[in-house]
Regions:
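Compositionally biased terminal segments of proteins
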Residues: 1-160
Length: 160
């Protein structure tokens, strides 16, 4: 699989995608959002990588272990900067690619499937991405979100 030349990823994102997929810290996370959708239906080029994890137990704290992620990222490239938004969210600028990590107390979509994609990297299924996009559109109005919903409807579940 030549991710670097994928139509779904911007060139600078494609260059780091495979290396990121080999990291241990990626295992509990699921790639969500426009990039996960683009990798499955190839309708637009995507630049950023949004990773989400949901906690299995009620008593677990929804937190991102950002020091561990930072250490692994620095072992394969350059972290330009990072922003610890909260205990449950951190954003890295890694090799000029925006990487976001989120932790949530439970799955918003209980039927979501994690699709194995490359090495340690999993994608959210298309139906779940559509549900997450609809929820996102309640908070913001970005053309890419509307386009993603349009693309999902147009595909009609052919990639499920």
């Amino acid at each position: 699989m030549n991710i670097e030349h994928s139509k779904s990823l911007a060139p600078h994102t494609g260059k780091v995608f495979e290396a990121i997929s080999k990291l241990e810290c990626i295992k509990p996370y699921t790639l969500v959002g426009g990039t996960a959708l683009s990798l499955q239906i190839e309708k637009r080029q995507s630049e950023d990588l949004d990773f989400m994890k949901w906690l299995a137990k009620r008593n677990e704290k929804p937190e991102v272990n950002w020091p561990s992620i930072l250490k692994e990222l620095e072992s394969i490239g350059s972290v330009r900067n990072y922003d610890v938004v909260g205990f449950d969210q951190v954003v890295f600028n890694f090799e000029d690619v925006k990487l976001s990590f989120y932790a949530a107390p439970r799955k918003a979509i209980p039927t979501m499937r994690r699709i194995p994609y490359l090495n340690n990297l999993y994608l959210a299924d298309i139906e779940s991405i559509g549900s997450m996009k609809m929820k996102t559109m309640l908070r913001r109005a970005k053309f890419r979100d509307y386009y993603d919903i349009y693309s999902i409807i147009k595909e009609g579940g052919r990639h499920q």
